[in-house]
Amino acid sequence: MSINRFKLQPLLPAIEQNALILVPNHRIRDAILCSHASQAGATVFRTPRVFAIDIWIRDMWELASNRALAPFCNLQLIDAVAEHFIWLGIIERSLSELPLLNPDQTARAVGQSYRSLKQWLSSGDGHRELAGATAIPDVAAFSNWVEQYQQYGEENQLINLVDCTQILLAALDRPAFNLVGEAVYLVNFYQPPPLYQQLFASLDAVAAVQVLQTSEAAPALVRHRFEFPDQATEILRCVEWARTLSRADSAAHIGIISNRDETQLKQLQRILKRELLANPVPIRANDGNPFNSSQADLKLIDAGIIHDAFALLNLGRGIQDSDDICRILRSPFTDGAEEEKEARIQMESFMRRNFGNRCQLSEFSRLLNSQSRDYYCPVLGAGFAGLARRARSLKGLASSAFWVGQIAALLADFGWQQTARGKLELEILDQWQEALELFANASVAVGKISFATALSRMQTLCAQQAQRLKFDPRCQVSVYSVTEAVGLSFDHLWLLGFDDRHWPEAASPSPYLPYDLQKQAAMPGSHSEVQFELARASFAVLCNSVSQSLCASHHCLDAEQQLSPSSFIADFPLADAALHRREHGATDGKPGIEATLSIEDLPGLALRSDEQIRGGSSLISNQSSCPFRAFAVHRLAAVAGAQFEAGLNSRARGTGIHVALENLFAGIQSRSDLVALSPAERRRRASAATAVAMETMGAKYPLVMTPKFAEIESERINTLLLRFMELESERKDFTVIA
C-alpha cells in the first residue's frame, strides 16, 4: 500500500480533463504525481500537467522568447545564481565607500529585499516611498544598489524571475501562450503575495481558472500536547513516536514539523537517521536517509570530495598554508592516494617537523620528487608539475565559462574526479557539475574576472547550495518547517519545539526597506502583528491537513531560560510524557541491543626480534592509566603531529641556537681561552657564529627568514651568545672535550 501525501480526490476532475495545474512548489508537485501514480492502477498512464509556479513562469517566458515576441525575445531570463553574482559584484564595488564585513551575506539580504519589494509592492507605490526615505543610510544605500542593478540589467538585457512576472501578467492574453479558454487549477495557494494575486487575476481574464484548497478538518483528529525538561529528551521522544508508528502502519505518512532552530534540526536529523535505520521493520530509504526533507544540514562545500577539490584549486596561488597541503596529502580523492599512502604519511610527518605555517609549492614539489627519500610521491609530484605548467594560463581576466574549463583541467591533472567510488560521492559530483554549469552560464553576470575571483565565486556558490536530498516516495517520515509542510497531507503529525519563543516566529524586518512600508504591505517578517496573522493562518491549514493524530511539544528549559508552550498549542490536551513513553515501548538503550555480546579478546602482538621499545616513566604511567594509550603511543607511535606555527617554532629556534653554539665553541677549548677573549673579540665571534646559524636557518626556512625577520632573529641569537659566554666565564675551570 502506498503512502498518501496529498488529498487527490478533489483534483481528479482536473487530471481527467488534462487541465493545467499550478502549485506553489516542487514538494506539492511531487506529492500529486506520486499519489496519482499509486492510484492509476496501470504501468503506463498519462502524466498530469502539474507545474510549480516559478517553473511555469519560466516556461511561458521561454515560449514567448522562442516565438520572437517582444520584449521576451530581447531579455535573457537569469537564474538565482546569476542574480546573486550581479548583486555581489555591485556591493563589492561599493566597499570603498561602505565597508562591509560580509559582502556575500549583504548581497543575499539585498537581493531578498529587492524581490520582496517587487512581490509585495508591485503597484509602484513602494518605489516612491523608497525614494522618499533616503535619509535613512541603509535605505539610501539600497536605493543606489537597486539603481545600479537595474542599469546593469538594461545594459546587458537581463531580467530576473520577479521582474519577468510583472511583464508576463500583462501579456497572458497573447495567442502565443495558448491560454484562452484553457482550464487552469490553482492548487493550495495560501497567502500568495500581491504580485501572484495580480498574475492569477490576469490568468483568470483569459482562462477558466479554478482555485482549489485541499485542507479540511478531520472529525476524528486526536490532539495531544507534551512538555519535556530539555530539548534532547523532546527530540528522543519524538523519534520514538515516529519509529513506533512506522512499525504499526507501513503506509502512514508521518510528519515532523521543526521550528527554525538549526541546532534542533541537526540533532533531529541525526537521531532520526540512526533510529529509523535500526528499525527491525525494513525501511526502503535513499542512500541511508530514511526520511524526506528539504532542509539538508550540510552544504555542498561540506562534502569531503568538494572540500578537497577547492584545496587543489587554491594551489594556483603559489604560497600555501601548510595545513592545506597536509589536507591534500591525506585526501583519498587524488590519483595515487592508495599506492602512495605510506609515502604521503612520511611527507606530512617531515613537513610538521621542518615547515612553518606557510609552504612554497616549488620547494614542496621538489621534495615530493626526491627519489632517495621515504616520502617520494611520483604520482602526486606529477600533478604538481602539471600545475606549474598550467600556471601561465591562470593569469589575467576571463569569463566564468573559460575558468570552468581551467578548473576541470586542473583537477584532472591530479586525477581528482576519477577517485569517486560510492553512489553518494557520484551524486555529489553530479551536483558539482551542475554548479559548474550554473557558474559558466553566469558569464554575463560576473563579467571578466581573475582566477582567484572565479574560485571565490565558486566557493560562494557551493557554500550556498545544500547537498541534495532527493525525494523518495517510499520514505514514511517527512521533516519540514511549517511553510514547507503547508499544502501536504499527513496521517500523523508532530509539532516539535513549539514554545513561546519560536512560534510565532520573531519579526525580522529588512534593514533596507522602511519599516512602516514593510508593515503596511504585510511583508513576512516585517512586524510581530504580521507574523502572528501569518502564523495563525498557516497553523490552521497545517492542522486541517492531518487525518489521525496531531502531537505538539516543547521543552521547558533552555539553558537558564524558562519556556512556555506557544499560544497556538496551549489548548491542546496536556498528556503525560511518561505515559506516552510507556505506550510506545521506549527504552533508554539503543534499540536492537537485547542481549550481551561475547567478544573474544585478541592476544597481544609479539615483538619482532629487531624491534626496540623506548619509554621511561611515561610508559609506566600510561600503562597504569590506560593500557590502550600505552600501546598506541609506545608501540604504534600513534601520536598527534606537531602543529604548524607562524614564524619559527620553538624547535627551530632551538636548532638555530645549537648551530651557533657549536660554531662558537669550535674555537674555545677551555675556560682560560674564554676568559682571555676581549669584549670586542667576544662580539666578533658571537657575530660570526650567529651568521652561520642564520645561513643554516635561511636555507631550511626560506619563507620565514625574510630580511626583517632574519635581522630580529640574528639580534636574538647574538644577544644569547654574549650572555652565554658571560655565564660560562664565571664557572670553574673546564675543558671542551666534544
Q: Where are these predicted regions, by residue range?
A:
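Polyanion-engaging groove/track-forming segments
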Residues: 1-734
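Active-site metal-binding core of divalent-cation-utilizing nuclease and nuclease-like domains
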Residues: 737-738
